[in-house]
Amino acid sequence: MEKYIMSLDQGTTSSRCIIFNKKGEIVSVAQKEFTQIYPKAGWVEHDPLEIWGKQAGVAGEALNIARISPEQIAGIGITNQRETTVVWNKRTGMPVYNAIVWQCRRTAGYCDELREKGIDKTIKEKTGLMLDAYFSATKIKWILDNVEGARELAEKGDLLFGNIDTWLIWNMTKGKIHVTDYTNASRTMLFNIHELKWDEELLEILDIPKSMLPEVKPSSCVYGETDEILFGVSIPIAGDAGDQQAALFGQTCFNAGMAKNTYGTGCFLLMNTGEKAVDSKNGLLTTIAVGIDGKVEYALEGSIFIGGAVIQWLRDELRMVKTAQETEKYATEVEDNNGVYLVPAFVGIGAPYWDSYARGTILGLTRGAKKEHIIRAALESMAYQTHDVLKAMEEDSGIELKALKVDGGACQNNFLMQFQSDILGVEVDRPEVVETTALGAAYLAGLAVGYWKDRNEISQNWAISRSFAPAMEDEKKEKLIKGWHKAVTKAMDWEERE
């Protein structure tokens, strides 16, 4: 009987299930979108019960599509939207409030209060994170302080907290297992990434009872088994990692200096720094890459706010293209950018500049500038921003970038990938299987149940669809980068400060 690994990929807009075979190839995919709830401006919520229902539904669907029985699943891996916060009553299994999503800004004011007290330095030292409403800690506090009766229940030990991974595992095991992994714990702003435990001082500052928190385990180990009611048989739940860390693992970035970039609406860059937690001087996050083989490995993380979103803007607002795919054709119809730079700082600019008052700008326009040059400049902006973050990572870690592995929608754009390689001066590798997030969770589960022997075996699975090698002369590259940096300085400090 042939065996497979099931991966539950619980994202921000949809719940998916992907089944993989021994070669790391996709056997079947099932996906369902769920409701985005916006109670007020800047607030974002999900219904945890809807997420669980849809996630269980797609698991059954993926088995049907693949025409395999639950007995053929050797293990289940879970990967999830990180930071999103669920608090539920352990006696009833019911959430006391909707899940507060990572994008939600409702606790920004409270974060400012903590910053005024200098707590941000303590948080950075212990958790590797910047004090921000993005992470789970202030979301938990908000629920305890604003939902009627929540704090009393928590003090009595009746409430549980979890990110989406914990919530899914709790439901899959019918409330037997309350657990998370090191990668998800490292995004709560409550976990000491050096001592590998929940931090008592931070819990005290935020007034969060420790009894609410899940047990923290490696990313690859058997946490428990699914309740038989789910599939008719018990299946080991054996892998768990936050989505970006799962993608790093799925891209087989197992050694220090290996990095991946996910080109989505924004871009997420992670670089493996090995067993060393690197403190960033450039405003990057220090995070846990994976907990495996009796140890944890660390990563530096940088995000770019506007990646593929700049292409959506060209399509929807400027109406320069009908589809995102057309941008490649237009960009290659001109020899170069003709001196045109586009800085997509629509919502400010992130690492390593960190200027929330920057705004988008197009510079270097002359009478010879055409639509094609603007489209090309938009694509190039993704590569320049990636370059800036990776250079900051190299500087922080003292580790030289060896190659960049890519995934996400925009990695299908060959012009962009070639330009990325030219600007970085390293090889850019696009894999055969671009579902690297789900694949990473599958690998973590498969290793724990012995489906794959070790990381070497997995590395042999990793197949390149296309590799892009740098082909630009150094002088030209330096000139382009200099032009980009000049453009960024013009975009900065534009919006009036209140």
From Swiss-Prot:
Catalyzed reaction equations: glycerol + ATP = sn-glycerol 3-phosphate + ADP + H(+)
Chain segments annotated as coiled-coil in the UniProt record: none
Binding site for glycerol: R82, E83, Y134, D243, Q244
Summary of activators and inhibitors of this protein: Activated by phosphorylation and inhibited by fructose 1,6-bisphosphate (FBP).
Binding site for ATP: T12, T13, S14, T265, G308, Q312, G409
Pfam family, one: FGGY_C
EC number(s) stated in the UniProt entry for this protein: 2.7.1.30
Record's keyword annotation contains Kinase: yes
InterPro entries referenced in this protein's UniProt entry, alphabetically: ATPase_NBD, Carb_kinase_FGGY, Carb_kinase_FGGY_CS, FGGY_C, FGGY_N, Glycerol_kin
Molecular function terms from GO: ATP binding; glycerol kinase activity
Disulfide bonds: none
Recorded GO CC terms: cytosol
GO biological-process terms attached to the record: glycerol catabolic process; glycerol metabolic process; glycerol-3-phosphate metabolic process
Associated pathway: Polyol metabolism; glycerol degradation via glycerol kinase pathway; sn-glycerol 3-phosphate from glycerol: step 1/1
Subunit record text: Homotetramer and homodimer (in equilibrium).
Protein family (similarity comment): Belongs to the FGGY kinase family.
Protein name as catalogued: Glycerol kinase
Organism: Clostridium botulinum (strain Hall / ATCC 3502 / NCTC 13319 / Type A)
Gene this protein is translated from: glpK
